[in-house]
From Swiss-Prot:
It comes from Rattus norvegicus (Rat). SUPFAM superfamilies: TPR-like. GO terms for molecular function: chromatin binding; DNA binding; ribosome binding. It is found in: Nucleus; Cytoplasm; Cytoplasmic vesicle; Mitochondrion matrix. A motif (Nuclear export signal) lies at residues 13-24. Residues 285-287 are annotated as: Mediates interaction with 28S rRNA of ribosome-coding tubulin. TPR repeats lie at residues 7-61, 68-98, 103-130, 136-174, 179-216, 224-253. The gene is Ttc5. This is Tetratricopeptide repeat protein 5. InterPro entries: TPR-like_helical_dom_sf, TPR_rpt, TTC5_OB, TTC5_OB_sf, Ycf3/AcsC/BcsC/TPR_MFPF. The keyword Phosphoprotein applies. Cofactor involved in the regulation of various cellular mechanisms such as actin regulation, autophagy, chromatin regulation and DNA repair. In physiological conditions, interacts with cofactor JMY in the cytoplasm which prevents JMY's actin nucleation activity and ability to activate the Arp2/3 complex. Acts as a negative regulator of nutrient stress-induced autophagy by inhibiting JMY's interaction with MAP1LC3B, thereby preventing autophagosome formation. Involves in tubulin autoregulation by promoting its degradation in response to excess soluble tubulin. The keyword Amino-acid biosynthesis does not apply. The modification Phosphoserine is found at residues 203, 221.
């Protein structure tokens, strides 16, 4: 190539790069130039901006021969929307064949495969890009892909989740001011939380990473997935006000995405049904309730009543039977409560299994049991003992509605004694987390 041709090609590439950068800036900074009310228009606006950019790129290219880099930039422009683009796949595949060291082409091609649903091919692209050059985009995307790879065993999936956290941490280390890296680290911790027995320390790390994403990058606050994923964690931790706020914000930012609105509505319906059932003690007639409570026996405490109960520290302790009304917020060590089931409530998500518990002292308390298999449950009239109950008082306000109730959180059905009997180990399952894979 002659010197002046080289210079022309260089200028053309520079102009193409500027056009693509402007396109991505339009998409990523959309809510800095538009109000949240325009959220429903965003995808259409981005699509139109992409078409305009592609026309401008064709004009700039003319008859100039600038192979791999130009193919990559055109493929990247086509890849700006959340949808899979076959044309982008063709252009980017050509680009990496012509110039295998072109890391950005590998990253873009990986994203195309990701949108196509070919997770294994996406993994190959991001891993391959890292062999050419360590870069934060490949690390971010590899973290994301590792959590979605098909595995033959739970152990293998756990290894992938741990590796996902490692890759996200490396991405953060490369640029602590990149909000996307912090957001993906939050998602990696979210998966780790559900994959390793819901350690509160890990949920705190997830929430901290999401907060850091918003702190270092204003655009992160406009990411509906961040709000939905964080709300999922808040809901599981029974921070219902924050969960509702997050679902609502995600729905506002992406009105075309039905899930946030559905999740907000489901949670509101759950809280409404629950508070109504608690207030009416499961609509149990006073005479029936009196008869049920009259059947409570010390024998119903099972291993919680004879000094054989083993606490979380592994020591055998004698538990003191106390009325539900005397419980303090938090874990009530050395205490056991015993009551009758007056209703049960399941949601579409099946987690938690919720039932109402009453003792002779009066008020009805919600008991929320986590990590249960679908076939497990308790029946109205069952006697249930809960050792060292973890109490929480809820005061929730959302969109003009108020919900107020008390609940006992039970991390596994294995802690419960039902009709004097400990629960079988087959009653326990582990929670999983679902997310929208194409939108990290």
């Amino acid at each position: 190539m002659m010197a002046d041709e080289e210079e022309e090609a260089k200028q053309v590439l520079q102009k193409l790069q500027e056009l693509v950068d402007q396109l991505y800036c339009f998409r990523d900074s959309y809510f800095e130039t538009h109000s949240v009310e325009d959220a429903g228009q965003k995808q259409q606006d981005v699509q139109e901006e992409m078409e305009k950019t592609l026309r401008q790129m064709e004009e700039v290219l003319g008859s100039v021969q600038v192979e791999a880099q130009a193919l990559m930039l055109k493929g990247k422009a086509l890849n700006v929307t959340p949808d899979y683009s076959p044309e982008a796949e063709v252009l980017l595949s050509k680009a990496v064949k012509l110039e295998p060291e072109l890391v950005e082409a590998w990253n873009q091609l990986g994203e195309v495969y990701w949108k196509k649903g070919d997770v294994a091919a996406a993994h190959t692209c991001f891993s391959g890009a890292l062999t050419h050059c360590k870069n934060k985009v490949s690390l971010q995307n590899l973290s994301m892909v590792l959590r979605q790879l098909q595995t033959d065993s739970g152990d293998e999936h756990s290894r992938h989740v741990m590796d996902s956290v490692r890759q996200a941490k490396l991405a953060v280390q490369m640029d602590v001011l990149d909000g996307r890296s912090w957001y993906i680290l939050g998602n990696a911790y979210l998966s780790l939380y559900f994959n390793t027995g819901q350690n509160p320390k890990i949920s705190q790390q997830a929430l901290s990473a999401y907060a850091q994403a918003e702190k270092v990058d204003r655009k992160a606050s406009s990411n509906p997935d961040l709000h939905l994923n964080r709300a999922t964690l808040h809901k599981y931790e029974e921070s219902y006000g924050e969960a509702l706020e997050g679902f609502s914000q995600a729905a506002t930012l992406d009105p075309a995405w039905p899930e946030p609105q559905q999740r907000e509505q489901q949670l509101l319906e759950f809280l409404s049904r629950l508070t109504n059932l608690l207030a009416s003690k499961g609509k149990t007639k006073p005479k029936k309730l009196q008869s049920m409570l009259g059947n409570l026996r010390p024998a119903h405490l099972g291993p919680c009543g004879d000094g054989r109960y083993q606490s979380a520290t592994g020591q055998k302790v004698t538990l003191q039977l106390k009325p539900l009304s005397t419980l303090q917020p938090g874990v009530n060590s050395g205490t056991v409560v015993l009551g009758k089931v007056v209703f049960s409530l399941t949601t579409e998500e099946k987690v938690p299994f919720t039932f109402g518990l009453v003792d002779s002292d009066g008020p009805c308390y919600a008991v929320m049991v986590y990590n249960v298999v679908q076939s497990w449950g308790v029946l109205i009239g069952d006697s249930v003992a809960i050792p060292e109950p973890n109490l929480r008082h809820h005061q929730i306000q959302h969109k003009g509605k108020d919900y107020s109730f008390s609940s006992v959180r039970v991390e596994t059905p294995l802690l419960l004694v039902v009709n004097g009997k400990p629960q079988n180990s087959s009653s326990q399952a582990s929670a999983t987390v679902a997310s929208r894979p194409q939108c990290e």
